[in-house]
């Protein structure tokens, strides 16, 4: 019998983030409490999102609106790393970036967790910015998925290519 396997990845669908960004921008332009505050949200580069507003509290409220839209589109908030608000002239800016890929450090933590607490006979291999988990039994793989879902590694994990 051949080994069954799945991949553990940390990826975000850019189109879904773009949709959430446009929804948040539309809400910022139409909501009464954001009128005349200069609140806006936009892409600045491939992976960076910039929020601007006249006051720090309006900036943080705009960030909450964006996070709400991310949640509605089933995007984990761990995938968005928001920076600190910074004042530049009369406006406040906040830049945040999308977190994608599993770092080597996190991959080692995940493999150690699988080795220590997972079922016997399960192998985990680091392949670039993703992780391949394989076993002879599919039940063991499902046990590993539930083990990893119950643990917080600080990144959004997805389980793909289940074979």
UniProtKB/Swiss-Prot annotation:
Molecular function per GO: nucleotide binding
SUPFAM superfamilies in the cross-refs: YajQ-like (SSF89963)
Gene3D superfamilies: 3.30.70.860, YajQ-like, domain 2 (3.30.70.990)
Record's keyword terms, sorted: Nucleotide-binding
Protein origin, superkingdom: Bacteria
UniProt xrefs under Pfam families: DUF520
Single GO cellular component term: cytosol
Function description: Nucleotide-binding protein.
UniProt cross-references to PANTHER family, sorted A to Z: UPF0234 PROTEIN YAJQ (PTHR30476:SF0)
Family the UniProt entry places it in: Belongs to the YajQ family.
Name recorded for this polypeptide: Nucleotide-binding protein ROP_16630
């Amino acid at each position: 019998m051949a080994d069954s396997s799945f991949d553990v990845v940390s990826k975000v669908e850019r189109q879904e983030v773009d949709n959430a960004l446009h929804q948040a921008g539309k809400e910022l332009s139409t909501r009464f409490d954001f009128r005349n505050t200069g609140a806006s949200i936009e892409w600045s580069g491939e992976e960076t999102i910039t929020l601007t507003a006249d006051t720090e509290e309006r900036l943080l409220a705009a960030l909450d609106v964006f996070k709400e839209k991310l949640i509605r589109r089933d995007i984990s908030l761990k995938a968005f790393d928001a920076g600190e608000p910074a004042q530049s002239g009369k406006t406040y800016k906040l830049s945040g970036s999308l977190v994608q890929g599993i770092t080597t450090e996190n991959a080692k933590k995940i493999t150690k967790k699988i080795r220590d607490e997972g079922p016997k006979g399960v192998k985990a291999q680091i392949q670039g910015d993703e992780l391949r988990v394989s076993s002879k039994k599919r039940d063991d793989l499902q046990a590993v998925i539930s083990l990893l879902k119950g643990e917080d590694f600080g990144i959004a994990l997805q389980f793909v290519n289940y074979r």
